[in-house]
Amino acid sequence: MPIQVLPPQLANQIAAGEVVERPASVVKELVENSLDAGATRIDIDIERGGAKLIRIRDNGCGIKKDELALALARHATSKIASLDDLEAIISLGFRGEALASISSVSRLTLTSRTAEQAEAWQAYAEGRDMDVTVKPAAHPVGTTLEVLDLFYNTPARRKFMRTEKTEFNHIDEIIRRIALARFDVTLNLSHNGKMVRQYRAVAQDGQKERRLGALCGAPFLEQALVIEWQHGDLTLRGWVADPHHTTAALAEIQYCYVNGRMMRDRLINHAIRQACEDKLGGDRQPAFVLYLEIDPHQVDVNVHPAKHEVRFHQSRLVHDFIYQGVLSVLQQQLDAPLPLAEEAPAPRHIPENRVAAGRNHFAEPASAREPAAPRYSTSSGATGGRQPAASWPHAQPGYQKQQGEVYRQLLQTPAPRQPALAPEAETAAPSLAGHSQSFGRVLTIVGADCALLERDGNIHLLALPVAERWLRQAQLTPGQTPVCAQPLLIPLRLKVSAEEKSALEKAQTPLTDLGIEFQSDAQHVTIRAVPLPLRQQNLQILIPELIGYLAQQSAFDAGNIAQWIARNLMSEHPQWTMAQAITLLADVERLCPQLVKAPPGGLLQPVDLHSVMNALKHE
């Protein structure tokens, strides 16, 4: 067969295969055209699920008579005129394919009138060459599009259409998505002559919430948390449901919009899912209605035939921005503040133990908290905000196969060679010979956060949160070199008082040694880097607490600051497992060997089983 140019009708039908998937696709394209025309009221009339009739009437700006024929031609649009326009597109449509594609698989009639015209005009295309006929008509200012007998000339496509009810449900969902995107537009949807949906335009926030309840249901509105988050040219607003009360029905509500355009973007969904994963079970999904506003130059919307997906030029920045925005509002809602309490100062850890450990524990971003009286109760990481688990009834079972394998590997690990100590270090620090010792064998987990150990033939109970706090303090305490700082992708900007600013400036050197880097101006401080153990914490709460602590101090020492931070970090383990406990103890043995040799009372306590055993021997 020789190469030849396809007839216009056939070419349009091929293009319609991408644009016109089902009646709901037609409704989406036509309603978006009405929105681009500035309509504030759109009426959608459907018959037989859209197979017989789709009528879209709006009060937009209308189309001039001279442009009606072009409106039905391929690649004809009023939205863009150059590549620069495409790269900064803000309208919903821009390709100029929708009307031509729809008219090639249906009987389409376009009637429109502008405010400057005294009469309306009607256009329709027919024939093999899709010739357009224009004639006068009666119509108010605005546009009406009628699509009759969809897929009448493509029987194969019509055969794959579902039942009338199913097709209308898809149309109903499209209108719901558009109504969520444009609260300022009235949308009326009717089916077979019966009014089904009426979404009236609203402007005030209270009215928006009522419309949100009408669109998403009262259960979602009751659990919805408001999000207002901004950084530079990025803005995130909307609602996310409380993950602790998300049901399977609520999880179906997942709507996200980029610059007013409805999206099904994997990057956005992943960021939201990651922010909520700690509060959701493995088989549950978050519920949300979110609006992302971004510089149009930073997003490419021309990557999907139906414009369902976009590509961000700085995808990691957008991901972390959405993640932190959602996580921030979840933490503010879910974590109740705990009362402040004075804590006894813990002895400073010996910096030389970092050298003896023989490895960099900054690769393990965990955190710790004293169970007695923590000052800081929220976390912004993927592990933050968990509720404390019930204690004794949830004791862990015996070894699992994977955990036992981890434990056997740890037992086979040879003790690292001890570095030679300088004479002054030998007198100032405890002997590191204890590093070759261990806490013993982990038998089981008791009460969610205690490990039952067998050590030297005796049974001991070890507080895992306390061990974790000691480990974090050792990780944060600078040794011969400062702690490595991790730059924040989105710097944290906080307003501070003159007293707090003065304290920060005085403590800048020890904070830098701890890996906390900041810049200050007249009334604000911008946190630009933190050590890795702090990356998974809610810095919006932890950093102000730290600034308040520094403002109360007269002297600033990196060790004392590291101790305070370690005591106020949020633990990532509400319920410890055997594998987690074994890994933690192995890290503590390597990094804090003096705790193995002389454990403090708050860390390890012996369990007297002899009296119990003697009682069992009585007949």
Swiss-Prot record:
Organism field: Citrobacter koseri (strain ATCC BAA-895 / CDC 4225-83 / SGSC4696)
Bilayer-spanning residue ranges: none
Gene3D superfamilies in the record: 3.30.230.10, Histidine kinase-like ATPase, C-terminal domain, MutL, C-terminal domain, dimerisation subdomain, MutL, C-terminal domain, regulatory subdomain
Pfam family, one: HATPase_c_3
Gene Ontology BP terms: mismatch repair
GO MF terms, alphabetically ordered: ATP binding; ATP hydrolysis activity; ATP-dependent DNA damage sensor activity; mismatched DNA binding
Lineage of producing organism: Bacteria, Pseudomonadati, Pseudomonadota, Gammaproteobacteria, Enterobacterales
Official protein name in the record: DNA mismatch repair protein MutL
Positions of region (Disordered): 364-399
Keyword DNA damage found: yes
Domain of life: Bacteria
Gene this chain is encoded by: mutL
PANTHER family reported for this sequence: DNA MISMATCH REPAIR PROTEIN MLH, PMS, MUTL (PTHR10073), DNA MISMATCH REPAIR PROTEIN MLH1 (PTHR10073:SF12)
InterPro entries tied to this protein: DNA_mismatch_repair_CS, DNA_mismatch_repair_MutL, DNA_mismatch_S5_2-like, HATPase_C_sf, MutL/Mlh/PMS, MutL/Mlh/Pms-like, MutL_C, MutL_C_dimsub
Assigned keywords, A-Z: DNA damage, DNA repair
GO cellular component, one term: mismatch repair complex
